[in-house]
Amino acid sequence: YDLPKFGNVSLLHMTDCHAQLLPIYFREPNVNLGFGDQFGKVPHLVGDQLLKHFGFKPNSIEAHAYTYLNFEKAAQTYGKVGGFAHLATLVKRMKATRPGALLLDGGDTWQGSGTALWSNAQDMVDACKALGVNVMTLHWESTYGEARVKEIEEKDFAGHIDIVAQNVKTTDFGDPVFKPYVMKNINGIPVAIIGQAFPYTPIANPRWQTPNWSFGVQDENMQKTVDEARAAGAQVVVVISHNGMDVDLKMASRVKGIDAIFGGHTHDGVPAPVVVKNAGGQTLVTN
């Protein structure tokens, strides 16, 4: 699996594995409704519409990866997808051929399997460290409770993985719960990686799991964080987000100074980024 080398900053992105350590059969949806001005646009394209938009051939490996078409036959041909062992091989190869490359995790990683539940997320925490994750943000991770998340951050991840989330604050005084961003030097280029945790956690998940944390999209604070990172010398600013792609597209139109948003949550297989124009230029959004 070779990708052409270009540029001097390489960022690898994974998201929404939902604690699946082993390969699985995965079928893309045959319905993805877009409402209002998003109707018929990426990421709301499925089947033949998606193939046509991105120029993929029917019955190809790309067609199997990104659509539901001929799923049973394609699954027999190409087999299962995913698995941390295979992912580790790819990550090692990418990092070996791209010095300084970082692996970003968009969240929904620690929860979703029996072993993750029984081990209180420890199996996935250890797997992520072994995989070489560098920076991550959160959603279902918070279902383990505030104390467990902070314990993992302060003990397991210390010196290994940064948890970032500009939109998670304490409910009493509005203090940051996590670092809003981290600055990484990649081959001499200062790169700011901002975190955007799932904004609707308190209503999508039981509130008792995060009673002292507030969330929300917080576009204004995102702009403030971007400006702060730029003022600190960042030549590249990216966001690892768990908003969902439609929310990311809207955020990209409102916040200037973000080069790219690596999205998650909505599980939209997007082969190429969507270019969003804004007051500062443009932002690339993918999922």
For each feature predicted by the language model, list its residue ranges.
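N-terminal catalytic scaffold of extracellular/periplasmic and nuclease hydrolases
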Residues: Y1-N287
